[in-house]
């Protein structure tokens, strides 16, 4: 519980308080537009298609990351006194050509497990794995290029833009993509633990 509360407080400080300070600074500096990088996580565990024009419809925001991302976007929507644009990328991963990334989180946590499997099992060995939920991962260069393009479009202030891959992958599919890249065995039998 102590670790959970510490992480919750850190996310609150970074996502909500940090956004509030940035919005206030942009207003005081007379910025022409506030560009907020949010996340598709603002939808929480919404079932179905969460469109760019949706916000209040978010569901099941119990997880600290979902909740703080949602609240930080709310700060922009309610307290920003200058024009703004909101960008909601999927889970950001490394550069599409080089793989380079400057932080390890999200899907990267599974890499160590896949490396361990690769080191003890032959590549031809079929594995059983979990396959729950859909993931949307986008390379960092795709996100940067999309934001650069959208930030320079005329007449889009107040807009919200999803920066996602139109081809979603299940957890099992994603793990197999990573396993193939690591020359590790694949998860040929996958089950949903629910």
Question: Where are the language model's segments positioned?
Answer:
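Mid/C-terminal beta-alpha module of Rossmann-like enzyme folds, strongest
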Residues: 146-194
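Glycine-rich Rossmann NAD(P)(H)-binding loop
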Residues: 92-97, 127-134, 161-169, 178-180
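Glycine/proline-rich active-site loop of Rossmann-fold NAD(P)-dependent oxidoreductases
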Residues: 95-108, 149-161
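Conserved catalytic Lys-bearing alpha helix of Rossmann-like short-chain dehydrogenase/reductases
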Residues: 16-22, 68-76, 110, 143
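Active-site Tyr-X1-5-Lys
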Residues: 25, 59-90, 95
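Conserved Rossmann-fold NAD(P)-dependent oxidoreductase catalytic core, especially the SDR/UDP-sugar
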Residues: 8, 13, 17-64, 84-85
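A conserved pocket-lining segment of Rossmann-fold NAD(P)-dependent short-chain dehydrogenase/reductase
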Residues: 7, 98, 107-142, 146-150
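Short-chain dehydrogenase/reductase
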Residues: 12-16, 61-70, 104, 133-137
């Amino acid at each position: 519980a102590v670790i959970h509360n510490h992480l919750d407080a850190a996310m609150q400080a970074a996502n909500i308080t940090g956004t509030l300070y940035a919005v206030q600074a942009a207003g005081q500096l007379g910025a022409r537009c506030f560009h907020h990088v949010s996340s598709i996580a603002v939808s929480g565990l919404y079932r179905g298609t969460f469109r760019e024009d949706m916000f209040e419809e978010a569901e099941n925001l119990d997880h600290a990351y979902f909740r703080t991302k949602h609240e930080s976007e709310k700060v922009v929507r309610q307290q920003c006194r200058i024009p703004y644009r909101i960008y909601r990328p999927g889970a950001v991963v490394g550069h599409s050509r080089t793989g380079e990334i400057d932080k390890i989180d999200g899907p990267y946590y599974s890499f160590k497990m896949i490396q361990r499997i690769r080191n003890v099992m032959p590549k031809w060995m079929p594995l059983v794995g979990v396959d729950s939920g859909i993931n949307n991962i986008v390379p960092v260069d795709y996100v940067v290029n999309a934001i650069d393009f959208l930030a320079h479009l005329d007449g889009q202030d107040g807009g919200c833009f999803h920066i996602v891959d139109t081809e979603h992958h299940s957890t099992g599919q994603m793990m197999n993509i990573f396993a193939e890249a690591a020359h590790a065995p694949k998860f040929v039998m996958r089950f949903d633990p629910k």
